[in-house]
């Protein structure tokens, strides 16, 4: 081969691995494929930052951008820094690009594919609607440009499309049927790399350093008591190994159990944000748990076991992928149509932790500060917002969780909100979490409340969950006057919960009637269509009736 031909071959020999989720080196089929073959003489590991995800939003109710609270932004940036460090140890690096045209991630990737003469593009498959539309643009460009594309499924244990195909073209609608169809997941890639191909010439492209969250203009966040959970693959593997070190705990793990008030040492693994960003491979995690199960005489089983939680995750991914309009009530054939209310006073009180119910408010403050709370705490505040007390649309709560949770996941977040509002999957709407007695079962002294609501730190434990019942003399001694230093309850739980049950019963009856209509189940192509509030019924709002002790 002459020198010109050799140079031409070298110029064409380039592969790109496009990171989106899957921010890891271990068990990463896209990275593994990109480093192999003739096109891997040079490897371009790319992540594209969308400015809209980071840009400060002064109108947002808490620090961060319109799309993400400061805790999740920080977790992402830490994950990118860690990925870059791990790639550098292998002789590579992360190429961080800024999206062109204010959010055109696909256009930015396509431009790099052309300018860097990429012959093979590898990226992890993503089933979210936004990602499907984005990836189609890139794949169409690649096809037209003669670029090979490899997009493996590795964010979940199973391929949702394959599960749906095995189920006759429909997603399985119960966990049990999903598990029966799924079987055992593929084995993870266990190879550990000693090096990766070098990065090729990037020309005149501006390669960004990973910014620090303090540099993004979110204002003074020093007092925000930011999350204890550091992002990145290194922390994910460390946390997983620490969780699995206690084999007896792993074998006996049962999801319904656990203390939602435990915050300094949470009662769960807190691996969900690492799975969400792909810092931890779900298949590798599953494989490690199974190794422990094989070494123990007895262990719990799905749905309550640790592996059962990973299967729940895949279940929601599969149902979400196979259900049009999964992220809204209208046009969603699996979601009950309920006349939820709109209330411009009650919703901000819930969102900002100002309901006057310390258990609810402490949870929402933990969410804002840490971006995480125990699953039973999530159940409490979701029930309170929707079918328990305020009867406000689950989509409103979903949006708050979507912005603030560091483990916010499109399929799981929407699925859980439909579940907890009794809109789908779970229908025992009469079972309501008490905003006063539920937390007390786990934390009678109210330590969780005292931590996140310091104004209540000196309230006697007899009144910590219902401070409005404390005599004025006790309130003065605790330096917390209800209605002045801490709000009065926005609703009377005893009254509001009865009204909610009544409205849920009426809505269920209406849905049964609608089942007989011939046009039942038609889909809407609109995205997150908002409900009209004109004919909706509002439970007791800020004009609260005289309060009784809640059950």
UniProtKB/Swiss-Prot annotation:
Residues the entry annotates as binding DNA: 312, 419
Marked site positions, Electron transfer via tryptophanyl radical: 340, 394, 417
Claim: Phosphoprotein is one of the keywords in the record: no
Domain of life from the UniProt record: Eukaryota
Annotated binding of FAD, by residue: 255, 268-272, 309-313, 372-375, 378, 407-409, 413
Record Pfam families: DNA_photolyase, FAD_binding_7
Biased composition (Basic and acidic residues): 512-522
GO BP: any one term: response to UV
Cofactor note: Binds 1 FAD per subunit.
UniProt-listed Enzyme Commission number(s): 4.1.99.13
GO cellular component terms, semicolon-separated: cytoplasm; nucleus
Compositional bias of kind Polar residues: 533-544
Cofactors (names): FAD
Region (Disordered): 508-551
InterPro entries noted in UniProt: Crypto/Photolyase_FAD-like_sf, Crypto/Photolyase_N_sf, Cryptochr/Photolyase_FAD-bd, Cryptochrome/DNA_photolyase_1, DNA_photolyase_N, Rossmann-like_a/b/a_fold
Similarity remark: Belongs to the DNA photolyase class-1 family.
Reported function: Involved in repair of UV radiation-induced DNA damage. Catalyzes the photoreactivation of pyrimidine [6-4] pyrimidone photoproduct (6-4 products).
Name of the protein: (6-4)DNA photolyase
């Amino acid at each position: 081969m002459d020198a010109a031909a050799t140079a031409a071959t070298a110029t064409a020999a380039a592969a790109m691995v496009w990171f989106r989720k899957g921010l890891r080196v271990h068990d990463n089929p896209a990275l593994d494929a990109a480093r192999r073959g003739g096109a891997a003489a040079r490897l371009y590991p790319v992540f594209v930052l969308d400015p809209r995800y980071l840009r400060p939003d002064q109108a947002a109710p808490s620090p961060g951008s319109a799309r993400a609270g400061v805790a999740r932004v920080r977790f992402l940036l830490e994950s990118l820094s860690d990925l870059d460090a791990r790639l550098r140890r292998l002789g590579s690096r992360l190429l961080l690009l800024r999206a062109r045209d204010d959010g055109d991630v696909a256009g930015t990737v396509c431009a790099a594919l052309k300018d860097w003469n990429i012959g093979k593009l590898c990226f992890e498959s993503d089933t979210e609607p936004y990602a499907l539309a984005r990836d189609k643009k890139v794949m169409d460009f690649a096809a037209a440009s003669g670029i090979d594309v490899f997009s493996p499924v590795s964010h979940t244990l199973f391929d949702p499309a394959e599960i749906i195909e095995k189920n006759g073209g429909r997603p399985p609608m119960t966990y049990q049927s999903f598990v029966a169809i799924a079987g055992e997941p593929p084995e993870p890639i266990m190879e550990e790399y000693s090096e990766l191909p070098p990065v090729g010439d990037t020309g005149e492209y501006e390669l960004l350093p990973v910014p620090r969250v303090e540099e993004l203009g979110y204002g003074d966040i020093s007092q925000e008591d930011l999350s204890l959970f550091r992002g990145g693959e290194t922390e994910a593997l460390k946390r997983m190994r620490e969780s699995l070190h206690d084999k007896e705990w792993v074998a006996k793990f049962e999801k319904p159990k656990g203390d939602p008030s435990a915050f300094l040492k949470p009662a769960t693994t807190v691996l969900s944000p690492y799975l969400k960003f792909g810092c931890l491979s779900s298949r590798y995690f599953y494989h490690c748990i199974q190794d422990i199960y094989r070494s123990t005489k007895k262990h719990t089983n799905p749905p309550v076991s640790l592996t059962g939680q990973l299967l729940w995750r895949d279940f929601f991914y599969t149902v979400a992928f196979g259900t049009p309009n999964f992220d809204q009530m209208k046009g969603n054939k699996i979601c009950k149509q309920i006349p939820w209310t709109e209330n411009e006073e009650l919703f901000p009180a819930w969102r900002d932790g100002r309901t006057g119910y310390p258990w609810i408010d402490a949870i929402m403050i933990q969410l804002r500060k840490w971006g995480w709370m125990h699953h039973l705490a999530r159940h409490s505040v979701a029930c309170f917002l929707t079918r328990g007390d305020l009867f406000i649309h689950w989509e409103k709560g979903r949006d708050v969780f979507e912005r603030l949770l560091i483990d916010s996941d499109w399929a799981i977040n929407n699925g859980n909100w439909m579940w907890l509002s009794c809109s789908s999957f779970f229908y025992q709407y009469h079972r309501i979490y008490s905003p006063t007695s539920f937390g007390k079962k786990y934390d009678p002294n109210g330590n969780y409340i005292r931590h996140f609501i310091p104004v209540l730190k000196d309230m006697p434990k007899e009144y910590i969950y219902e401070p409005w019942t404390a005599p004025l003399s006790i309130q003065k001694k605790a330096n917390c006057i209800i209605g002045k230093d801490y709000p009065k309850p926005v609703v009377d739980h005893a009254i509001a919960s009865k009204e909610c049950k009544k409205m849920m019963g009426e809505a269920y009856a209406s849905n049964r009637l609608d089942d007989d209509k011939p046009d039942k189940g038609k889909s809407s192509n609109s995205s997150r269509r908002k409900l009209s509030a004109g004919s909706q019924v509002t439970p007791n709002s800020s004009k609260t009736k005289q309060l009784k002790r809640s059950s």
